[in-house]
A protein has these predicted regions:
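ATP/NTP phosphate-donor binding region
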Residues: 1-4
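Flexible glycine/proline-rich
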Residues: 10-164
């Protein structure tokens, strides 16, 4: 939270809410906040997403969309996860990372993932064509600094798959 961010103090002091979490050890999306607010009709949920476009997209798919799907009564509120083969080497970050990719079906029926390019939170271009999010482990936790082309990685499907 920046020094000019008034959302958390407003939730706590003005709305008598509880911040359930205010920072997440992940990339992108570190400043994501989730809070609950008591109302006469029950507890209301508030998600505050980061301001950078890529961070907002990733945290929406990871947190907000599953919450909306659950509130709608869906039996399985999470988006599908599939094993995908990396089309190129991928460097790991010290934090767990959700890397934007384009996933397509291979001639053999497998899935392959191609990075959409630079993954900085502010890079809107990395959103273009992204239909998946690689769930990359932390380099700090694993002691591994990169994953190699051809390795299988879990990916969340966030759009229609492409074909080769």
């Amino acid at each position: 939270m920046g020094e000019l961010d008034l959302l958390k103090p407003t939730i706590e002091r003005t709305l008598n809410g509880t911040i359930q979490f205010g920072r997440i050890a992940m990339k992108p999306g570190k400043p994501t906040t989730f809070a609950t607010i008591p109302t006469p009709n029950g507890t209301k949920q508030i998600f505050a997403l980061p301001g950078n476009p890529a961070s907002a997209l990733v945290t929406f798919h990871l947190f907000v969309l599953p919450a909306l799907r659950k509130a709608s009564g869906l039996e399985n509120p999470t988006l599908p996860i599939a094993k995908v083969s990396l089309a190129q080497d991928v460097k790991l970050d010290p934090r767990p990372e959700y890397h934007r990719v384009y996933i397509s079906v291979t001639k053999e029926g497998g899935l392959t993932a191609v990075s959409t390019g630079g993954q900085r939170s502010s890079r809107v271009g990395s959103l273009r064509g992204a239909n998946g999010l690689l769930a990359l482990p932390s380099a700090k936790d694993t002691g591994i600094h990169s994953l190699k082309k051809g390795e299988l990685v879990d990916a969340m499907i966030i759009g229609r798959l492409g074909g080769i």
